[in-house]
């Protein structure tokens, strides 16, 4: 995807914490799956956005929240494979909801990167949905056996984070 690039963080925790805090402001709405990782919860809490957790993998509940907030900036956040119980999100269904309600989709691929997809690119890659994911975050510390994490997003989002993401700016770079 030509208009995208990546940014590397020290860890998945640093990535989620800083990205969500930097991108979401007062008046915005973060809608997060109930079983999302603590780093996502902490990033949402540190932002000034309203934070609502929808019932795990419940698209009816998610759609109700989306439809009740038509005029707000909305960020849907989910893991592709959930660390809490190992099940998977319906990424195609989430892509449909984000389009229908003019929301952005943030996908944490920590537990699918290096496992799913023909080149280990994660579940969105395997499902051929990568172009529909606004923000993709994954870690090198699980299946890849390394250190750090990354975000893959449009150039303007990456450029913004380089200048505004505190967990990126105020951390020592990886060796």
Model regions: which residues?
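Short, structured coil segments at secondary-structure junctions
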Residues: 47-48, 132
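Conserved Walker B
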Residues: 35, 81, 109-111
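Short loop-beta-helix segment that forms the pyridoxal 5′-phosphate
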Residues: 1-18
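Substrate-binding/gating loop at the entrance of the active-site cleft, primarily
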Residues: 10-11, 31-47
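Active-site PLP attachment segment
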Residues: 119, 125-160
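Conserved PLP-anchoring active-site segment centered on the Schiff-base-forming lysine
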Residues: 19-38, 59
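Active-site phosphate-binding strand-loop segment of PLP-dependent enzymes
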Residues: 52-107
């Amino acid at each position: 995807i030509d208009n995208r690039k990546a940014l590397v963080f020290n860890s998945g925790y640093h990535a989620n914490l800083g990205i969500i805090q930097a991108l979401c402001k007062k008046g915005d709405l973060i809608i997060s799956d109930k079983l999302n990782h603590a780093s996502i919860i902490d990033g949402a809490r540190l932002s000034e956005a309203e934070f609502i957790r929808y019932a795990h993998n419940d698209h009816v509940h998610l759609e109700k929240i989306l439809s009740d907030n038509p005029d707000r900036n909305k960020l849907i956040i989910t893991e592709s494979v959930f660390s809490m119980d190992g099940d998977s999100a319906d990424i195609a269904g989430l892509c449909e909801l984000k389009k229908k309600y003019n929301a952005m989709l943030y996908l944490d691929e920590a537990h699918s990167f290096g496992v799913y997809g023909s080149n280990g690119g994660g579940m969105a890659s395997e499902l051929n949905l990568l172009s529909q994911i606004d923000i993709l975050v994954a870690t090198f510390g699980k299946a890849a056996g390394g250190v750090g994490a990354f975000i893959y997003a449009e150039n303007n989002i990456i450029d913004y984070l380089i200048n505004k993401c505190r967990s990126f700016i105020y951390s020592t770079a990886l060796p």
